[in-house]
UniProtKB/Swiss-Prot annotation:
Family matches, as SUPFAM superfamilies: HydA/Nqo6-like
Gene Ontology MF terms in the entry: 4 iron, 4 sulfur cluster binding; iron ion binding; NADH dehydrogenase (ubiquinone) activity; NADH:ubiquinone reductase (non-electrogenic) activity; quinone binding
Protein name as it appears in the record: NADH-quinone oxidoreductase subunit B
Signal peptide residues on this chain, from the entry's feature table: none
This protein's encoding gene: nuoB
Residues at which [4Fe-4S] cluster binds: 56-57, 121, 151
Keywords (A to Z) from UniProt: 4Fe-4S, Cell inner membrane, Cell membrane, Iron, Iron-sulfur, Membrane, Metal-binding, NAD, Quinone, Translocase, Transport, Ubiquinone
Length: 177
């Protein structure tokens, strides 16, 4: 019933030794992983997004939460407060007057925080790009993790962007050492 130590005698290749030990323990009903992997797995399955809807893209954003697309089945739930959310979705035309409010809301979010820029206006100013009062992309105010193109992007495109964010979180890891 004991675990053999052959995995520990595999030499300097720790990854190979870990894989051997993991294969042996799986047959006995155990899982070998790291704390960082568990935290990232939990983080991707419980994203709480906050809307920062500024224009017509916000209507498409609402469709993502409705029964047809149901983002909650992927562990992505809406929240009203920035202090309870991990993800901010910026949708619509960001004006110079609204930019400080966007930054203030972003600063109120707990770490780690992510931003999705939704639509042509949020990505780069869109139709109003040459207007004197429009910020040419919300990435000039806050760091953006995922860009969702379109005018307005469909609910499927936003859902795909949210799933890509989950994939990015799993791939990169966010624990500071």
């Amino acid at each position: 019933m004991g675990v053999s130590t052959a995995a520990y005698d595999a030499g300097p290749d720790k990854e190979h030794a870990t894989q051997l030990l993991n294969n042996e323990l799986q047959d006995k009903g155990f899982l070998l992983t790291s704390t960082e992997d568990i935290i990232n797995w939990a983080r991707t399955g419980s994203l709480h997004w906050m809307t920062f809807g500024l224009a017509c893209c916000a209507v498409e954003m609402m469709h993502t939460s409705m029964p047809r697309y149901d983002a909650e089945r992927f562990g992505i739930a809406p929240r009203a407060s920035p202090r309870q959310s991990d993800v901010m979705i910026v949708a619509g035309t960001l004006t110079n007057k609204m930019a400080p409010a966007l930054r203030k809301v972003y600063d109120q979010m707990p770490e780690p925080r992510y931003v999705i820029s939704m639509g042509s206006c949020a990505n780069g100013g869109g139709y109003y790009h040459y207007s004197y009062s429009v910020v040419r992309g919300c990435d000039r105010v806050v760091p953006v993790d995922i860009y969702v193109p379109g005018c307005p992007p469909t609910a499927e495109a936003l859902l795909y962007g949210l799933l890509q964010l989950q994939r990015k979180i799993r791939r990169t890891g966010t624990i500071v050492r």
